[in-house]
């Protein structure tokens, strides 16, 4: 059994940012061995375990194969023979496909560190195209304060355009889309999320009426209300928007309608 720290926490550490949490991959182990060592199984689709003390997530190394539509249309394979590099290859971006061993050595088979230094967002493999959620996640990464100036690699732009040309985005659940939107709204550069959707025609079917982007607002619900306002309050009718967001948007809409009506009377 070998344990490696992986993913976004490595990226953030290399940028001098303390990660909020850490993810771990276990190579050469089995579910039975993990549970025998006190780990608690929590994964439904693939083996993920909680550390008995830190409660951090530890996943067995795995590969995945497209077997259906949408981000859930994958079959996962895991056994002790799967290597760390095989596990890293399934990750979305090169800057998220790095690992660190217990001696602090960085394992970087896809040159994520170089892309990090050059401020480039680049997909790890052609498998990026198989999961439409990766396009939405990439848009969200552009809202991060330490990533918002990163450029999207030309070849990755081509991937986004290909995803936009299919109907794969429609296979995503409304709940999953809103989760990404909500995460983006909680970031300082949330307008970048919507800019990417517009730039790469990723607006259908969830943001069909999205034409303009605004960065006004501090709290997520006010940001959402402002996005709605500049798009004539016609945006994302099929998303499970929380009531507090809806109420804030409705108050602003009624206020603007009242002002407009009063102006006409004058």
What are these regions (language model features)?
Residues 1-266:
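Catalytic cores of the polymerase beta-like nucleotidyltransferase superfamily
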């Amino acid at each position: 059994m070998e344990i490696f720290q992986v993913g976004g926490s490595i990226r953030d550490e290399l940028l001098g940012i303390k990660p909020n949490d850490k993810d771990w991959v276990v190579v050469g182990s089995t579910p039975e061995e993990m549970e025998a060592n006190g780990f608690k199984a929590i994964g439904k689709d693939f083996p993920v375990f909680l550390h008995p003390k830190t409660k951090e997530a530890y996943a067995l190394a795995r590969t995945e194969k497209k077997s259906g539509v949408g981000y859930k249309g994958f079959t996962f394979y895991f056994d002790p023979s799967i290597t760390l590099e095989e596990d890293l290859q399934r990750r979305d971006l090169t800057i998220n496909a790095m690992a660190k061993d217990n001696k602090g050595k960085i394992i970087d088979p896809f040159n994520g560190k170089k892309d990090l230094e050059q401020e480039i967002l680049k997909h790890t493999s052609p498998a990026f195209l198989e999961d439409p959620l990766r396009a939405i996640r990439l848009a969200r990464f552009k809202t991060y304060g330490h990533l918002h100036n990163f450029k999207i690699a030309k070849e990755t732009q081509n991937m986004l355009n290909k995803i936009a040309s299919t109907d794969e985005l429609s296979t995503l659940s409304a709940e999953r889309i809103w989760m990404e939107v909500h995460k983006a709204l909680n970031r300082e550069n949330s307008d970048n999320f919507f800019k990417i959707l517009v730039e790469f025609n990723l607006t259908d079917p969830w943001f069909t009426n999205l034409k303009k982007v605004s960065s006004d607002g501090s709290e997520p619900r006010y940001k959402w209300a402002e996005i709605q306002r500049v798009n004539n309050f016609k945006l994302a009718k099929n998303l499970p928007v929380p009531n507090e967001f809806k109420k804030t948007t409705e108050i602003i809409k009624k206020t603007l309608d009242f002002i407009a009506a009063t102006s006409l009377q004058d």
